[in-house]
Curated annotation (Swiss-Prot):
It comes from the Bacteria. The keyword Lyase applies. One of its GO terms (biological process) is Mo-molybdopterin cofactor biosynthetic process. The lineage of its organism: Bacteria, Pseudomonadati, Pseudomonadota, Gammaproteobacteria, Enterobacterales. Catalyzes the conversion of (8S)-3',8-cyclo-7,8-dihydroguanosine 5'-triphosphate to cyclic pyranopterin monophosphate (cPMP). The gene is moaC. Its EC number is 4.6.1.17. It comes from Yersinia pseudotuberculosis serotype O:3 (strain YPIII). It catalyses: (8S)-3',8-cyclo-7,8-dihydroguanosine 5'-triphosphate = cyclic pyranopterin phosphate + diphosphate. This is Cyclic pyranopterin monophosphate synthase. It holds the Pfam family MoaC.
Length: 159
């Protein structure tokens, strides 16, 4: 079994030292879902929400969140992201919104947490903007879809 990298030999949490690692191209993709009533989703699709464009706001929130992941997750490194993409897709057949994020960089550590944070905060933003209309929306699942680059190799979720 792989060891936890953020725990030292004394069992204490610490930030991993990546100074000796080589810089490599890295990418991670994540997804999140927000389930809601058909009427709430229709309001988003029609652009009739009184707070404005829900998708545009969620997209910007996701991008901002990826850039601030190191401030939110205690042991994450600050990263020089070269790409953050947040795609939002209304899925009326399932009464939900699907969010897919992609983060890239060339660096010494991966971008999985940035992709997951972007997806999570975009979902939370949709909830925040729509909670006046519907409070029982469900966020989830949130998961890593793929990651590439780095010492641990590539990962792709089984669909």
């Amino acid at each position: 079994m792989t060891q936890l990298t953020h725990i030292n030999t004394a069992g204490e949490a610490h930030m991993v030292d990546v100074s000796a690692k080589n810089e490599t191209a890295r990418e991670a993709r994540a997804e999140a879902f927000v389930d809601m009533q058909a009427a709430t989703l229709a309001m988003i699709i029609d652009g009739s929400h009184h707070k404005g464009d829900v998708f545009a706001t969620a997209r910007i929130a996701g991008i901002q969140a990826a850039k601030k992941t190191w401030e939110l997750i205690p042991l994450c490194h600050p990263l020089l992201l070269t790409k953050v993409e947040v795609k939002l897709e209304a899925q009326p057949e399932h009464n939900r919104v699907r969010i897919e994020t992609c983060c890239r960089l060339t660096g010494k550590t991966g971008v999985e947490m940035e992709a997951l944070t972007a997806a999570s905060v975009a979902a939370l933003t949709i909830y925040d903007m729509c909670k006046a209309v519907q409070k029982d929306m469900i966020i989830g699942p949130v998961r890593l879809l793929t990651k590439s680059g780095g010492k641990s190799g590539d990962f792709k979720v089984d669909i």
